[in-house]
Amino acid sequence: MKYTVGVDIGTFETKAVLVNEVGEVEAQAHKPHKMLVPQPGWAEHRPNEDWWGDFCEVTNKILKMSSVKPEDIKGLACSAIGPCMLPVDNHGEPLMNGVLYGVDTRSHEEIDILNKIIGKSKILEICGNALTSQSVGPKILWLKRNKPEVFKKTAKILTSTCLLYTSPSPRDRVL
């Protein structure tokens, strides 16, 4: 029989489900984690622990609960909180905690700067949306302005799901 794993990384927990080819649930697991608030208006997760570590833990739990062999897993679907901002180095390793979606409001000054430089109407025309605390662009500008040493080392900006789907050497195999 073939199986599919679904994983959802949420603000306060990670959940996994294992379903067989006819859609029956074989196993479910979850793992709580905390949203870090290092300063008022900031919201973060520890990517290696809260995203990657929880992903590994819940997927291993459902495999053990079900006795399904990893080679019988034919599909993997991930959803996660977002949009988040995670700067990584050229090896794919996180350079800081992941900055969460709209609950993190640290980039309000950068939103104002971008609106003044580019113009609200031009941003709306290009993006189809206004800039808000949900937007990643202002958070990247915040990173450049407030953590230049991290920004210089940044090779890519990932989201939480991108961290799961990219496979730097320590993450080569999950199952």
Feature annotation, model-predicted:
Residues 1-97, 125, 153:
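N-terminal glycine/serine-rich phosphate-binding loop of ATP-dependent small-molecule kinases
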Residues 42, 51-52, 102, 142, ...:
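Signature tryptophan residues that serve as conserved aromatic anchors
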Residues 56, 86-141, 145-146:
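Glycine-rich phosphate-binding loop and adjoining helix at the ATP-binding site
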Residues 59, 63-66, 115-118, 144-151, ...:
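Structural signal for hydrophobic packing residues in well-ordered secondary-structure cores
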Residues 165-175:
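Single conserved hydrophobic/aromatic residue that forms the stacking wall/gate
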